[in-house]
Design a protein with these regions (language model features):
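Alpha-helical, largely C-terminal catalytic domains
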Residues: 1-349
Length: 349
């Protein structure tokens, strides 16, 4: 295994978390309880073979994947929100496999074996063989295929290939101990699954916006801003998890190691970016709503859903044990002193 960098801050770290000013309200899909129940069964029956042991499976069962799906896609059709939860669990698992420094996150050769197994499922070349990684990806794709138009499915598979390609770049960079500049880092991580997820949101609503995305630069820019929001929010809350794994592929680490910021300054910069990206999205959304394409009911509904995705991802990030540690139950504190340890995030208030 390649060496990872020594911890730059020690084994118990404190900082002040500013309250993040929010513009867009939070909304949750009314079928959350059902989605959670069915997603638990899905993880057990379809993904269990991907995990290294039972403890890892249990952790994924408690990470609130279905809640994330229901918060970022609250207006999905009832029969599709469950598939959105399945998507979340499946691809969050692949993200763990490829990003965890204790798994394959610093082992390019082994990671490439997984990627080579998955790619035929994304290229229309799957012959029904392959290992467990291909089967899980293939089955997840096939669940949505009957409800997607051919052009939407083609775009979705392209999104997933971009996701996989970004994994490859990240594993190699992590193994070399390289820390990219902020723009390179942001571009790489926006590519890592963000557009694939937004296509799933679009699918959840029952829309196919392929043509609109091809012709409207503004709509593409709005979706890009959602992807940027995902990255900056996730990096704030996932810093604990990644730092204690020895993974410096995180915005806070980029600001500290490449820009020379202290931890508190890096946290405040990231919180400022979270607010800035949301403001930019709201402005872009208003611009589109005032244009010809913004008169379309499907475009208007999708723009509304993209806003909920921004708000929902932030809300979920306070709550999930995925970032905050096993057994985490959020106490409602949004600002104040925070302590991070290898086991958990503690919100002191």
């Amino acid at each position: 295994m390649a060496e990872v960098r020594p911890k730059m801050l020690g084994d118990e770290v404190e900082f002040y978390l500013p309250e993040i000013k929010r513009i867009i309200p939070v909304k949750c899909h009314p079928q959350y309880a059902r989605a959670e129940e069915l997603n638990t069964r899905y993880i057990r029956s379809e993904l269990r073979g991907l995990y290294r042991d039972e403890a890892e499976c249990q952790r994924n069962l408690t990470d609130l994947h279905a809640l994330w799906a229901c918060l970022v896609n609250p207006n999905a059709k009832d029969e599709r929100i469950v598939k959105g939860a399945y998507w979340t669990s499946c691809w969050f698992t692949y993200d763990d496999i490829m990003s965890d420094a204790g798994w394959l996150g610093v082992m390019p050769a082994q990671a490439q074996e997984v990627i080579d197994d998955v790619l035929p499922a994304l290229n229309g070349e799957d012959d029904g063989t392959g290992k467990k990684y291909r089967k899980a990806a293939r089955d997840n794709i096939l669940m949505m295929q009957p409800d997607m138009t051919p052009r939407q499915m083609k775009r979705y598979l392209r999104n997933l290939r971009e996701y996989i390609d970004a994994f490859t770049d990240e594993v190699v960079m992590r193994a070399r101990g390289e820390i990219p500049d902020w723009k390179t880092y942001l571009d790489m991580h926006v590519t890592s699954g963000c557009e694939a997820n937004l296509t799933v949101l679009e699918y959840g609503q029952g829309f196919d916006l392929t043509e609109e995305l091809e012709t409207s630069k503004e709509l593409r820019e709005a979706r890009r801003l959602v992807g940027e929001s995902y990255v900056v929010v996730n990096d704030l809350f996932s810093f604990r998890k990644e730092y204690f794994q020895g993974d410096y592929g995180n915005a806070i680490s980029v600001f500290m190691l490449n820009e020379g910021l202290q931890l508190q300054d890096a946290v405040e910069k990231l919180c400022g970016l979270i607010e800035e990206v949301e403001r930019k999205f709201v402005e872009k959304r208003e611009e589109i709503l005032g244009s010809n394409i913004g008169t379309r009911p499907d475009v208007r509904a999708h723009l509304s859903e993209l806003g909920y995705a921004i708000a929902g991802n932030l809300e979920w990030s306070y709550r999930t044990p995925r970032y905050n540690g096993a057994g985490h139950v959020w106490n409602g504190v949004r600002s104040g002193k925070v302590t991070i340890t290898p086991e958990r995030t503690i919100y002191h208030g």
